[in-house]
Regions:
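Glycine-rich beta-strand-centered segment in the early N-terminal region that forms part
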Residues: 1-2, 14-82
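C-terminal boundary of histidine-terminating zinc-finger modules
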Residues: 107-109
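Glycine-rich phosphate-binding loop and adjacent beta-alpha segment
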Residues: 206-294
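Cytochrome P450 core scaffold surrounding the K-helix E-X-X-R motif
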Residues: 5-11
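Mid-domain Rossmann-like dinucleotide-binding core that forms the NAD(H)/NADP(H) cofactor-binding site
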Residues: 112-185
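A structural motif shared across PLP-dependent enzymes of the aminotransferase-like
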Residues: 82-94
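Short helix-loop-beta connector
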Residues: 73, 102-105, 127-134
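Adenosine-nucleotide cofactor-binding segment
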Residues: 153-231
């Protein structure tokens, strides 16, 4: 079972881990931390609640129900996305199990849902909302590298935004065609040029706080203005969208309104997206994950 950022958020909440202390016994350890007073209002509903952790995992089916579908899973190595996965055993519906290809270990399949489905979900969102290319921040992450491989395979334009030259080098070595380093003095000009080249009008931002989301919208508007055939004081009529899906920067999200009126900014999370597209579409995404698990 892997530890995803969403698992860490559930494990620790708003706790100040610098105050952590360990008690209990070796067989049943207890970790106690303090929550800053300013954060307690947001954590109030959690007090006294038992919240099992672990979004995803994989293992061997050792017992099953009487249905043919369940019995067919006996002895199979399966991946599961169902919560409460930090356990030795987990009971879950047969139709929520993804049978892994022969020769795949549980360790190889344990992380085959959250990051791969998130990357595929971003591409699917782009398509469903009528965009032709996308922007991704914190692009040198494991998720970002997966998204880069997907876009290269599917022929989709992708603008990768990173924070360090070595991250840019990593992605370029993996075939990334558009990489913009936010630490470079020419970042905004580089980003605008990449947006002109790809036509990207949707972005997925893992940072959340700071000026980056607004800068992306501003550069999208500047890129669209280069090909505009007529002037409008309201800016381009092409919709520009930024979805925030992470909080690497916990500060306020700052925007400067220099991108017209055809824009949107909102949140994006994997599980609400999967609920929205329905079981058939979700199964198609899972099937692709299984088919490309070792790519």
């Amino acid at each position: 079972t892997p530890i995803n950022p969403s698992d860490i958020g559930l494990l620790f909440g708003a706790a100040d881990m610098a105050t952590a202390r360990v008690s209990g016994t070796p067989a049943r350890p207890v970790v106690t931390t303090q929550v800053p007073e300013r954060a307690m209002k947001g954590m109030a509903a959690r007090v006294g609640q038992s919240l099992p952790v672990g979004n995803e995992g994989a293992g061997t089916v050792v017992a099953a129900g009487a249905s043919p579908a369940a019995q067919a899973l006996l002895g199979k190595t399966v991946a599961v996305l169902g919560g409460a996965m930090y356990a030795q055993y987990r009971t879950i519906r047969a139709d929520q199990c993804l049978v892994l290809p022969d020769g795949t270990t549980a360790a190889e399949g344990a992380s085959c849902f959250v990051n791969p489905l998130t990357a595929l979900g971003m591409v699917e969102t782009m398509r469903r909302e009528g965009h032709k290319a996308l922007v991704h921040t914190a692009a040198a992450s494991n998720l970002g590298q997966m998204l880069n491989r997907i876009c290269l395979k599917d022929g989709i334009g992708l603008v990768n935004i990173v924070r360090k030259p070595e991250q840019a080098a990593l992605l370029k070595a993996q075939g990334a065609q558009q990489v913009c380093d936010a630490s470079a003095p020419s970042f905004l000009a580089d980003l605008t040029e990449s947006l002109v080249q790809t036509g990207a009008t949707i972005a997925f931002d893992a940072t959340g706080g700071g000026r980056l989301a607004g800068q992306i919208l501003g550069c999208m508007e500047a890129a669209l203005s280069r090909t505009a055939t007529e002037y409008s004081r309201y800016g381009s009529t092409t919709h520009k969208q930024v979805y925030i899906y992470g909080g690497l920067d916990t500060g306020p999200t700052e925007i400067i309104r220099n991108f017209g009126f055809a824009w949107g900014m909102g949140g994006w999370l994997l599980f609400p997206f999967l609920q929205k597209i329905g079981p058939e579409a979700v199964q198609a995404l899972k099937a692709r994950v299984a088919a490309e698990l070792k790519t």
